[in-house]
Design a protein with these regions (language model features):
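Conserved N-terminal segment of class I S-adenosyl-L-methionine
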Residues: 1-71, 75, 133-136, 140-147, ...
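Short beta->alpha junction loops/turns
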Residues: 2, 81-84
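Redox-cofactor binding/interface segments in oxidoreductases and associated redox assembly factors
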Residues: 28, 78, 108
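A short glycine-/small-residue-rich loop at the edge of a beta-strand within enzyme catalytic domains
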Residues: 47, 83, 101
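Active-site micro-motifs of SAM-dependent methyltransferase domains
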Residues: 66, 83, 115
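A short beta-strand submotif of the Rossmann-like class I SAM-dependent methyltransferase core
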Residues: 75-81
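S-adenosyl-L-methionine-dependent methyltransferase catalytic module, highlighting the catalytic core
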Residues: 86-101, 105-174
Length: 174
């Protein structure tokens, strides 16, 4: 969780769909706590934090596209991760096809068009300690290229914060 606007989006979704934030199994992709995490959103949860780098809020060290637990999750959440994941298309597909149960919710935030590169050796390496050689802003078009949103989700919403250059999404899997 990198800035206030992301919290506003997550709290908007929580208010809209509160049943996904209490007594649920949660998987957080890109969970390393660099400047906050997503646990505060949930009550009475079972939570697994997945990241490629060990540290606070990380339970399993794995790439998002390679993580294949034996259970499906009620909620998969990811904040400010996909722009640092060179395999983000495969990660998105793994989340929807493997990690998320039917009827479960996927929620994410990521950098989109206009955001300055961050978390690389050229910019601010501490912002993404394990992926300093890759960065790409992700657009709604990129997500729709990776996933057939209409076929995968019964309900969904994209939003863009043009001031912070964030892409926001939540969807309820069919």
């Amino acid at each position: 969780m990198a800035h206030t606007e992301q919290k506003v989006w997550c709290n908007y979704v929580k208010k809209k769909r509160p049943e996904f934030f209490k007594n649920v199994h949660v998987c957080d992709i890109g969970s390393l706590d660099i400047n906050g995490n997503n646990r505060y959103l949930f009550e009475g949860y079972k939570y697994i934090g997945v990241d490629i780098y060990p540290g606070r809020n990380v339970d399993v060290i794995s790439r998002g596209h390679a993580f294949t637990p034996l259970i499906e999750f009620d909620v998969v959440i990811s904040s400010e991760c996909f722009e640092h994941d060179e395999f983000y298309t495969y990660t998105l597909q793994n989340i929807v096809r493997t990690l998320l149960r039917p009827g479960g919710m996927f929620i994410f935030t990521c950098a989109t068009d206009g955001r300055h590169e961050h978390g690389t050796r050229r910019t601010s390496p501490a912002d993404s300690p394990a992926t300093q050689d890759y960065y790409m802003n992700i657009s709604e078009h990129d997500v729709r290229t990776a996933l057939n949103i209409e076929a995968e989700f019964d309900e969904w919403e994209f939003d863009v914060n043009h001031r912070t250059h964030d892409l926001y999404f939540y969807g309820i899997k069919k």
